[in-house]
Structure formats: C-alpha cells, structure tokens
C-alpha cells in the first residue's frame, strides 16, 4: 500500500513494484497478520504501507547527500521543502535523485532517476489539502531472468562463481512510473475527521530478456530441458522474451473517524468506502532456446545472439474492479477493557480476454484488549482472509481467491512513553485455495507453470519483538519468529521459506564522543529446502541455516554535516536466495560511504 491505498500486481510480469525508491517516503509501516479490514483483500502474512513525504516545514529546509560504494555505485539525493506563502499555510516539497551502479553479476548495470513534488495546504482551521506528482525511471542492462541451472542429470548439484550470469549484453528491462495523488482532510465536531485519498498511476515497461532452465550433462556441459518428455518442441532449455506493457490504476478511499459517547463512556468509530480499477495490458514475443544454441554451459559466457523477433502479440488484457464498504468501532467496556469489532464488504471482479470472475466477500474482524496496568496489555483477535491471486490453473484461468481465518493471542508492553515496546504473539492461520505448483507447463502457453488449489493449509507459530531505547544512547530492535505450515495431509507447505528467523539491529552513541554512533545488525534464518520432480528422479534443493552480519558507523562532523559508512555481509557469506531448480546467489560483501548535509 501507498498512503493506505492498496495496489495489486501481476507477478508474471516484472513491473518493478519493489523498486520504488525509499527516498520518496517518510516511513514504512508494517501491519502483521491478516489485513482485510484495511485493504479489502486480507493477506495472511503482513501489509507494508509506504507513507509519502509531505511538506511540513514553515521555513526553508533541506538535505543533500552523495553515496559511493561497491560495484561503481553512485547515488545523489536532494530533499527540499519551503513555505510557498508568507504565512506558511501553503508549503511545497521536492525530492529528486539519481543512482547508477553495476553489480556483482557480470554485465549488469542499473540506472535510476526519481522525482517527487508535493504541495500541502491548510485551507482553514479545519481543512487541509495535499496534492503531488511522482516520477521514476529505471533502466537495467543485462538483467537476469531466473537463475543458474542447479542440477546435473545425475542429481549432483552445480556451483558457480557468484558473478556468473546467463544474460547477454543485448538484454534490458526499462520501466517508467508516473503517479498523481491527492488527500483532503476535514475536521469537524471536535473529535471527528473525514479523509479522502485518491491516486492515478501508470507504469510502463519494455524488456528483452533471456532465461535458462535446464539440467547439465556433466560429461560435456550440454543442457537438457525439463519438459522434453512432453513431446516434440518441448526440448527447449530456456527462452527469450520481448515483453512490454502498461498498468493503470485509479483508486479512491473515503472514510471518517471520530469519537462518540454511549452508556457514559467514550468510544471510537470509523466508517468508509473505497473503489479501485486496475488494468494490466501486456504484449509479448517469445522464442525458445534449444541446446545446440548454447553448447556447453561450462564455457557459456552470455555470448548469445539477439533473437530475430517476431512482432509482439497481445498476451494479457485484464481489468480488476474492487468496491468496498467498511466499518469498525473501538468500544470501551471498562477502563481496562476494550472491544474492537469491524467488517468490510468487498465486491471483487476481474475481466480477462477469455472469461470473467467475480467474488463477494465480507471480512469480519474482532479483537479484545485488556490493559493489565500502565505498561502491560494483552489481546486476542480474529479476522478472515480473502486474497485474490494471480496463479493459473492447467486451463490458463486464475485460481479462485485464497480464503481462510486468522487467530492471534498476544501480550504487549510500553515503557518510557513508547520509547521502548515489546510484543509476544501466538497465531494460527487456516487457508483454502492455496496455490501449489504442478510442475507441468500450461498447454499453449509460453512456458507458464500450471498451479492447483490446495485446501486445508494450516500455519501456526509464535513471534517476539522488542524495539526502542534501552538507554539514552543505546537503541535496539530484536525480533524472532517460529512457525510451521502443513497441508491437510500433514505435509510441509512452502518448505523453501524459513520456519525460524531472528533479526537484531542495534546502534550505540558513545557518551565520551557523542558525535560518533556505531551499530550493526544480524539476520539469521534456519535451513530451507524444496523438492523438484525431474525426469531423472526427485531432487532436493537445500540452503543451510545462515546469518548475515552488517555494520555501520556515523560521524557527525558538524551540526549539519555527517558521514556514514556501511559494511554489508561482513563475512562474505555465500547463500542461495532461490530454493528450486535454479540458483540465485545473494549479495556478496560490499561497502558504501554516504555524506549528508542538512540545512
């Protein structure tokens, strides 16, 4: 979500949804657990809400920074805000930046430009208006599309230099992002406020890419495709694709929230509605890659001629509509006891080139919070799950949305006016219609794998987090999660995802030298695996448990000028981020230094 408005994307086409530059946002909010009351489509894991930067200063202020790092990274950011009227009731802010970097991957280069302009205005004592425009362009040369072949035909595993890439130098992946947005807030009746958020966004992309998906013959390095036993023409070992398209989103969310009195007690109420329309239109031209075109993979270095492309044809033209009405109230049953109940009604419809699908769903929510004392509280909550998905069945149709229930029981504490908080929670998630790969390509597709819906998936676990100030000079965030997920026959679901994770980040300002701050972080995850059924037997891909250690130091040279150094993957750990039939290595050790000036 961005400013509370959700965006749903088609994972078959890489539109760069994860590439929005963080310099454009003030903060990132993470809401754990099913979130259908917020978004209309409840994801059982979490929702990330990106909050845009706004013009809040009534005087001219700004920040400029320059960063240099490994793989020829250079990055420059300017963030300026100023009053636009003498009384400061109308203010403006612009954020602009440029980044260029190579990679540990051979031939890879990325260039990014971004800009955001926003005007915030106080139209009176009770009315405010925000309006803005955002632009990003990302050009990537020699991007990877998938990974490196993991398996030899005898079941043994391959290993490669982390710099190895299958991408030829003619491949690219370019994207343009344009967004306009507006927010109006109206306060009335003392404790009440109405808010309207609206946005229009367009994303365009154009790419020519290549992938390799095959097994390696150890004798000579030749490649053998995974689908050759399906008949003539299926012996390909990869493919090239010229893909382009556009996604347009129009969305509006209108809600009011405030307090009301009932039975001598003060309560809170929120009422709202939302509408969104999203169109995804993509065109493509594909060609299969056969073993003789690559030769021995042992000597292949990305020297592959560009495809003689056929004209593009329409591959997808889908329009998704979502209409929602929602309400929630926080009822004060007693001084220490609060009941939160709510529901969201959603009408969701998708129209494709060949068929339509429509779902109506009511997402209820109920929670009970008990304040044990000034610092401790306990809670219990329930909500349902309704999550449209973009996986296709064997006939090429979308699977029905995931449905289910989410239960949670927790204990929270709050210390020193929220400077330090802790959370302990246990949860249980029940889901139906969960997509599971069949490993079989969809007939007539460009290699898309068919999925089937699986009912009776159950996940249960526990998580703990402590976040905030341990002392005036010491900040720490520590979190740990453990869960299990099984289907209705007791088999592990998505064992390629870590069941146990531990995250620690800390920073310390030296009392004897307050200009100097040092810190670091550790991310640890347990062993993961994935079984792949191949023509040569069932092969298991595994990644053992590992920890990544990062360090940083910041020195405040003057009141306005600071320098920070970052060292990522301190021990240069080699690890695999893609536990299936291909290998995708994670980022090796790298360093960067950033100089920042505030005024």
How should these model regions be labeled?
Residues 430, 524-533, 551-599:
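C-terminal beta-signal and adjacent terminal beta-strands/loops
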Residues 5-32, 51-52:
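Short acidic/polar hinge/loop motifs at secondary-structure boundaries
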Residues 99-103, 116-187, 202-247, 292-318, ...:
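Acidic/polar loop-and-plug regions of large Gram-negative outer-membrane beta-barrel proteins
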Residues 334-336, 452-533, 571-574, 594-598:
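Gram-negative outer-membrane beta-barrel transporters
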Residues 180-203, 236-355:
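Face-selective signature of the C-terminal outer-membrane beta-barrel domain
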Residues 120-122, 247-249, 265-278, 314-431, ...:
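Structural signature of Gram-negative outer-membrane beta-barrels, strongest in the C-terminal barrel
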Residues 185-187, 193-199, 203-209, 371, ...:
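Membrane-embedded beta-barrel scaffold of Gram-negative outer-membrane proteins
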Residues 9, 24-26, 37-117, 123-127, ...:
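Outer-membrane beta-barrel translocator/receptor signature
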